[in-house]
């Protein structure tokens, strides 16, 4: 599989699911369009990343699969919360999220490619998970920011890290989606796209034989 992303978290999730990956980072303009809804934004960016990567390829992947994704943290009240520009920005974001529920949406675009990189099929979807934070004190926010954990993450936190998980009171939806890629949904979409005879069991068989 070709992954059109440099995210170490997406790479880890896919490798844990049994995929051998080739990384193809896609450089696109990620600015939102006027009045574009958050879910429409991530769907569009994922599709543009997939196409940008496809255009750079001279040969299709062995399994024919190319996957691109884009994840945002947002709420109707706060808008889209990107990666912090500095520690103070991270503090402001975490204070705004304190005691509230926000959304994490990931747009995914999957292409089935021929050996000459022609598109044989495609799948596009958006997965959204609701995340609720505990009420955070200023001292708790400062302690978390001091770890450096927020600085490369949308929304200024990482649910998968030992420190970041302590901020989260509850989630409703797919945990992997908050990390960066909704693996269970992706597996089902890939099964439909590739029409493997074993359906959703095919990646699980790969995992069982790898142990």
Segments (PLM) and residue ranges:
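A short beta-strand-loop structural module common to alpha/beta enzyme folds
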Residues: 22-30
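Cofactor-binding loop segments of dinucleotide-utilizing enzymes, especially the Rossmann-like FAD-
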Residues: 6, 26, 113
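N-terminal beta1-alpha1 ligand-phosphate binding loop
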Residues: 1-19
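A local structural micro-motif
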Residues: 21-22, 198
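Flexible, glycine-rich phosphate/dinucleotide-binding loops
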Residues: 10, 30-32, 117
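Anionic-ligand binding patches
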Residues: 2, 15, 35-211
């Amino acid at each position: 599989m070709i992954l059109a992303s440099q995210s170490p978290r997406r790479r880890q999730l896919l490798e844990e699911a049994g995929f051998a990956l080739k990384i193809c980072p896609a450089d696109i303009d990620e600015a939102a369009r006027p009045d574009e809804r958050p879910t429409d934004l991530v769907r569009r960016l994922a599709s543009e990343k997939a196409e940008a990567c496809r255009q750079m390829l001279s040969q299709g992947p062995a399994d024919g699969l190319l996957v691109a994704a884009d994840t945002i943290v947002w709420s109707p009240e706060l808008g889209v919360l990107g990666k912090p520009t500095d520690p103070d920005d991270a503090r402001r974001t975490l204070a705004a999220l304190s005691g509230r529920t926000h959304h994490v949406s990931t747009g995914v675009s999957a292409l089935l490619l021929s050996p000459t990189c022609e598109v044989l099929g495609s799948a596009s979807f958006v997965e959204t998970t609701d995340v609720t934070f505990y009420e955070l004190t200023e001292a708790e926010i400062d302690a978390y920011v001091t770890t450096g954990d927020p600085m490369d993450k949308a929304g200024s936190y990482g649910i998968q890290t030992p420190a970041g998980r302590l901020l989260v009171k509850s989630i409703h939806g797919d945990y992997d989606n908050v990390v960066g890629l909704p693996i269970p949904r992706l597996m089902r979409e890939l099964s439909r796209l590739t029409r493997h005879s074993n359906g959703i069991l095919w990646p699980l068989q790969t995992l069982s034989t790898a142990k």
